[in-house]
Amino acid sequence: SALLQFDATGDERFLELGRSNTIERMASHVTHIGVHDHGFNNVSTYGNLRRLVLEGRLPRNEWELAFYELALKVSGAVQAARWGVTSDGTGYVCSFNGPHSLFCDTIRSMRALALSHRLGHRLQGENDLSISLLDRLVQHARTTAKYNVFYGEGRDTYDVWGRVAHEAVFNRNDGRFRTPATHQGYSAFSTWTRGLAWIMSGYTEELEFLDTIADADLDPLGGRADIEAMMLRAARASCDFYIENTPADGVPYWDTGAPGLAAMGDYLDRPADPYNDHEPVDSSAAAIACQGLLRLGRYLLDRGDPAGEQYRHAGLTVLRTLLREPYLATDPGHQGLLLHSVYHRPRGWDHIPPGRRIPCGEAVMWGDYHLVEAALYASRLAA
């Protein structure tokens, strides 16, 4: 968030904070072989620093730029090496749960592979096998779209257009898909809304990335038309589900199937209530989803599809809500920016204030980061 704060304000205190902490603390994340988070951790640090250099916001020092780019090359390759194979011949980047596990979140980490590929890097495997990071990105996107996103096609009793499963579980003996699952959501058959938001933002971002790739590079992977159609379908389905299952102000409750929602009447027809007694909202999900809606709206409008207006307006509605109380922190003593975020409701990791029955009033790092990122994105669209 510090680097984005500098981007937004020009306050060099935040630049120094972000740059020094990246250099001092992030090397272990570049080579971390046990997580699915490279796109979150490294693109938001080394990636933003590289972008600021290329935009002329920082003095151009070739060695400094090479340092950031080396980190991004390595990060994308390390992430791509955490690989599982399915029975249908495709693959996926495994979650930190293990080789059986595909998280919906990881679609946002594909930007680590995308940047590494754009920088001309490949993953070197056994016997010096040279592995395309673009190929692994597309395979992961296909597998996630097939097993984590639902399209109302009767895959199970609760299959509706745009539902998202947090996790897809595979049998590692033969690679066959076994079941949807969740860890931070309520049920495998409901939708954890932050996971939904990762799908929304991840696929729309990768659609933009495809615009930078030559047709010849996509032809061996199925071709541009097929790949774009797959990603656009997942993006539209998830964004439609978000709009349909979120209160009128654009801030969702933490899971669409959370049991306490049944006691809240027509909760979708009014603004979300972070101070209710039944289920918490997750403003961090809204901050992430906001960007997905705005990006999808722009993508469609740029192609002459008027349906993009609905998504653009929905994204602006979400952003307008988050930049006001009760979501925007106004107490100078509070360390966060975006209030009423949730980390892990099932495990009880979220603070419940005295006199309250549910978590409220706190911020999380990814909520703050994505709020600032969404605001910067919207300001660039308006420029």
Predicted stretch roles:
Residues 1-383:
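Glycan-recognition and catalytic cores of secretory/periplasmic carbohydrate-active enzymes
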